A protein has these predicted regions:
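Non-heme di-metal
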Residues: 1-148
Length: 148
């Protein structure tokens, strides 16, 4: 039976080491089967629904990747900064994965920027409000790191 570790016993250095050991590459995932299913098994409504969902995830991951740096800068300890930097890399990796899927499977966009632009109209009002607030929080923290 695996030993359990209490959350307060896990250090930021432990979290960083776990992150290093568990990496995967967004650029190496093969979407050939996904493309085949997209083209031949999904109905038009399935494709529209899936693209809407993937677009929300894509924009969310991109927004968090863009907005984590002030939180990293404001972290009080170096170990916290290093761990938070891993989270920023993970958000970027997730955005790259969704961008590739949207481009290679759904056929939207030619690169990350154009895929973001092409899927922008799919974002709902509520989604936009949440991530606009994240943008503002990042801007506020950039100006004053003492804000919680």
């Amino acid at each position: 039976m695996p030993a359990t570790i209490a959350a307060d016993q896990i250090s930021y250095a432990d979290l960083y080491a776990r992150w290093e050991q568990g990496n995967w590459r967004a650029t190496e995932i093969d979407f050939a089967t996904d493309r085949e299913q997209w083209d031949h098994e999904f109905s038009d409504i399935d494709r529209r629904s899936a693209l809407w969902t993937y677009s929300l995830f894509f924009h969310g991951e991109d927004s968090v990747a863009d907005n984590l740096s002030p939180f990293i800068d404001a972290a009080p300890r170096e170990e916290q900064k290093y761990f938070l930097a891993t989270q920023q890399v993970d958000e970027a990796r997730h955005a790259v994965l969704f961008a590739r899927f949207i481009r290679e499977v759904a056929g939207a966009g030619a690169d990350i920027g154009s895929s973001l632009e092409e899927t922008q109209p799919k974002l709902t009002w509520g989604f936009r409000k949440v991530f606009e607030r994240l943008d503002r929080m990042g801007d506020e923290l950039r100006k004053d790191r003492s804000k919680p």
